[in-house]
């Protein structure tokens, strides 16, 4: 059976990490693409990782390029191309320049990889994934945004740290836009099946501490930006996107929070927003509509409003 093909658009920190993880998991052959001025970076990283494969013990072909024709036949395309956040910069500040980049990338994908499952990482995420779907014209089930898996992973890590338990036993969901208005769901998050509110009653933690963890989750990206000072997170975002790609390529049908296009679910129509979905061979095969209480719904609505305004700004900038 022929190997699958994974195309990575953007050979920066996330792109390089994606290339390594995809190879280590033997998901397929990898194409690392960047702009002509950075073609050497794409080729250099591809060669460097290929040379690591005999040591690590995995088989994968690696190609570095600046030519979109090399995306031909890609099963998955993961898009990281764009300008990273700098300290003091909000995700929204990135709209203008990244919208132009996404338009160019989307046209390349539409022409050369029309059957691909597209995962967008570029910020501001919810607006960029919507723009990608518009530019490609792909079925919305085949265009998805990586945000919720990352935000939930951060939430899970903070909770595991607080409870001093394995991250594997912590399940957590983050809904809404990938930004300051995201909604980490305390009610639907558990440790070994025990909901967080019950753990508060059991004396494992306090509501105040949980509130602090929720806020730290919202600020998770900015915390990393502030520490690195030279860019934004790349290990956890790459791991999150690879988990999504693997679920698609292997038809695992994992339930993951992702930015998906809603068609009436949660009272939202025609907008990409973070919700739990099932990812399988058909792409986004199902949107899981969980019941929200009044407080959660209010926070979710606020997040949706923030995404809507961002989409409007993007539409003006992108023309």
From Swiss-Prot:
EC numbers on record: 1.1.1.37
Binding site for NAD(+): 10-15, 34, 98, 121-123
Alphabetic keyword roster: NAD, Oxidoreductase, Tricarboxylic acid cycle
CDD domains reported for this sequence: LDH-like_MDH (cd01339)
Family listed: Belongs to the LDH/MDH superfamily. MDH type 3 family.
UniProt-listed InterPro entries: L-lactate/malate_DH (IPR001557), Lactate/malate_DH_C (IPR022383), Lactate/malate_DH_N (IPR001236), Lactate_DH/Glyco_Ohase_4_C (IPR015955), Malate_DH_type3 (IPR011275), NAD(P)-bd_dom_sf (IPR036291)
UniProt entry tagged with the keyword Oxidoreductase: yes
HAMAP family: Malate_dehydrog_3
Species name: Rhodospirillum centenum (strain ATCC 51521 / SW)
Residues the record lists as binding substrate: 85, 91, 123, 154
Domain of life: Bacteria
Job of this protein: Catalyzes the reversible oxidation of malate to oxaloacetate.
Pfam families for the chain: Ldh_1_C, Ldh_1_N
Reactions catalysed, as given in the entry: (S)-malate + NAD(+) = oxaloacetate + NADH + H(+)
Protein's name in the database: Malate dehydrogenase
Active site: 178 (proton acceptor)
Any one GO biological process: carboxylic acid metabolic process
GO cellular component, one term: cytoplasm
GO MF entries: L-malate dehydrogenase (NAD+) activity
């Amino acid at each position: 059976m022929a190997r699958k093909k994974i195309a990575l658009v953007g050979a920066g920190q996330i792109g390089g990490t994606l290339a390594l993880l995809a190879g280590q998991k033997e998901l397929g052959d990898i194409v690392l693409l960047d702009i002509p001025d950075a073609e050497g970076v794409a080729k250099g990283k591809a060669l460097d990782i290929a040379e690591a494969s005999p040591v690590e013990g995995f088989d994968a072909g690696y190609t570095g390029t600046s030519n979109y024709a090399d995306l031909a036949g890609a099963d998955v395309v993961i898009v990281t191309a764009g300008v990273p956040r700098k300290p003091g910069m909000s995700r929204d500040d990135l709209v203008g320049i990244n919208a132009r980049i996404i338009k160019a990338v989307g046209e390349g994908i539409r022409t050369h990889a029309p059957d691909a499952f597209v995962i967008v990482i570029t910020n501001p995420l919810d607006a960029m994934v919507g723009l990608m779907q518009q530019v490609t014209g792909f079925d919305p089930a085949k265009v998805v945004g990586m945000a919720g898996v990352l935000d939930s992973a951060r939430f899970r890590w903070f909770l595991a740290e607080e409870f001093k338990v394995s991250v594997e036993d912590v399940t957590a969901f983050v809904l809404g836009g990938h930004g300051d208005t995201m909604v980490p769901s305390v009610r639907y998050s558990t440790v070994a099946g025990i909901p967080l509110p019950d753990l508060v009653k059991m004396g494992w933690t306090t509501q105040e501490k949980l509130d602090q963890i929720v806020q730290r989750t919202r600020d998770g990206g900015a915390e990393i930006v502030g520490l690195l000072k030279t860019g934004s997170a790349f290990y956890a975002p790459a791991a999150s996107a690879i988990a999504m790609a693997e679920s698609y390529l292997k038809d695992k049908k994992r339930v993951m929070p992702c930015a998906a296009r809603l068609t009436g679910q949660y009272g939202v129509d025609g907008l990409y927003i973070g919700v739990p979905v099932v990812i399988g061979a058909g792409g986004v095969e199902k949107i899981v509509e969980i019941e929200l209480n009044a407080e959660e719904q209010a926070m979710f609505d606020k997040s949706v409003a923030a995404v809507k305004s961002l989409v409007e700004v993007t539409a003006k900038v992108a023309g």
